[in-house]
């Protein structure tokens, strides 16, 4: 497995693989790998001949009060896991490499990023779409795999890819869960034992909402009340937002769920200083 740190070497490596008619799949990460990330590699290798992983803790997507400095950095462990999963190359640039002195160009997706994470974390999605655009240009992939857990991020990247005509297929990867249903996340390590035990309330709430919809409930207000009530049953849980949105536009649905439409149920809940995101897709 190659480890590349410079833009020119990464571009040259990808170009040589393309000349050899290899299909390239990229898996962008911030490191601190877990089974969810490794499932992205597995999916990439179903769509491509070669898996490239990027490991970059992106300063542009962290707000001033967020955990950039303490975000876990475990590169040696990550490299070992990536190689075992079948990654052929890791691109691991420094912030100075991607954002040299004088850098001033950013990529912004407007409407999709306005609410929810975009409202609570100003500038976050501008940082995400900027770095992803750069990584597409540097790694030159045919396909790029992103997890469905970060649903608003996935929607923003899909919109960017479409609007800016990136010749990259965006492949969504299903959420990977612990045995008790908690969505795998690099931030789960911040939970203390009591918080970790109660964190299952997110997936439980989604399952309750799915069941209600399967049994005919279509009123959004009623569904949100069901979700909120179950989350509040966990004493340590503090909801940031609970919503049902159109899966493509990410616009909130206010009244009734309609037949032949696709929705996302979104949850973001705080346990102490740790924010956990989860969602489920509803196709009617």
Swiss-Prot record:
Residues that bind beta-alanine: 61
Domain of life from the UniProt record: Bacteria
Assembly behavior: Homodimer.
GO molecular function: ATP binding; pantoate-beta-alanine ligase activity
Pathway stated in the Swiss-Prot or TrEMBL entry: Cofactor biosynthesis; (R)-pantothenate biosynthesis; (R)-pantothenate from (R)-pantoate and beta-alanine: step 1/1
Its biological purpose: Catalyzes the condensation of pantoate with beta-alanine in an ATP-dependent reaction via a pantoyl-adenylate intermediate.
An annotated GO cellular component: cytosol
Something else known: The reaction proceeds by a bi uni uni bi ping pong mechanism.
Taxonomic path: Bacteria, Pseudomonadati, Chlorobiota, Chlorobiia, Chlorobiales
Keyword Iron: no
Subcellular location: Cytoplasm
Family that this chain belongs to: Belongs to the pantothenate synthetase family.
Keywords, comma-separated and alphabetical: ATP-binding, Cytoplasm, Ligase, Nucleotide-binding, Pantothenate biosynthesis
SUPFAM superfamilies xrefs: Nucleotidylyl transferase
An individual GO BP term: pantothenate biosynthetic process
Protein's recorded name: Pantothenate synthetase
Organism expressing this protein natively: Chloroherpeton thalassium (strain ATCC 35110 / GB-78)
Active site: 37
Pfam family, one: Pantoate_ligase
Binding positions for ATP per the UniProt entry: 30-37, 147-150, 176, 184-187
Binding site for (R)-pantoate: 61, 153
Gene3D superfamilies with a match to the protein in the record: HUPs (3.40.50.620), Pantoate-beta-alanine ligase, C-terminal domain (3.30.1300.10)
EC number(s) on file: 6.3.2.1
Catalytic reactions on record: (R)-pantoate + beta-alanine + ATP = (R)-pantothenate + AMP + diphosphate + H(+)
């Amino acid at each position: 497995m190659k480890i590349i740190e410079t833009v020119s070497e990464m571009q040259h490596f990808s170009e040589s693989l393309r000349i050899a008619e290899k299909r390239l799949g990229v898996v962008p990460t911030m490191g601190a790998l877990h089974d969810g990330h490794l499932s992205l590699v597995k999916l990439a290798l179903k769509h491509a001949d070669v898996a490239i992983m990027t490991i970059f803790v992106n300063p542009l997507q962290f707000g001033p009060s967020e955990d950039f400095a303490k975000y876990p950095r475990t590169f040696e462990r990550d490299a070992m896991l990536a190689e075992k999963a079948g990654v052929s190359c890791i691109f691991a640039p420094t912030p100075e490499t991607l954002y040299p002195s004088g850098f001033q160009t950013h990529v912004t997706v407007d409407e999709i990023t306005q609410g929810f994470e975009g409202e609570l974390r100003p500038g976050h999605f501008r940082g995400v779409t900027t770095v992803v655009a750069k990584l597409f240009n540097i790694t030159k992939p045919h396909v790029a795999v992103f997890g469905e857990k970060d649903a608003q991020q996935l929607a923003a990247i899909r919109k960017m890819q479409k609007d800016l005509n990136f010749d990259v297929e965006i492949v969504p990867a299903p959420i990977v869960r612990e045995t008790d249903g908690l969505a795998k996340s690099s931030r789960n390590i911040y939970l203390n034992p009591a918080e970790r035990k109660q964190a299952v309330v997110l997936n439980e709430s989604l399952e309750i909402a799915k069941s209600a919809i399967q049994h005919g409930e279509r009123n959004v207000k009623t569904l949100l009340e069901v979700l909120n009530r179950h989350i509040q049953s966990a004493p340590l849980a503090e909801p940031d937002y609970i919503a049902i949105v159109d899966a493509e536009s990410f616009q909130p649905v206010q009244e009734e769920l309609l037949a032949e439409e696709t929705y996302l149920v979104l949850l973001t809940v705080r346990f102490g200083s740790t924010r956990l995101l989860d969602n489920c897709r509803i196709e009617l």
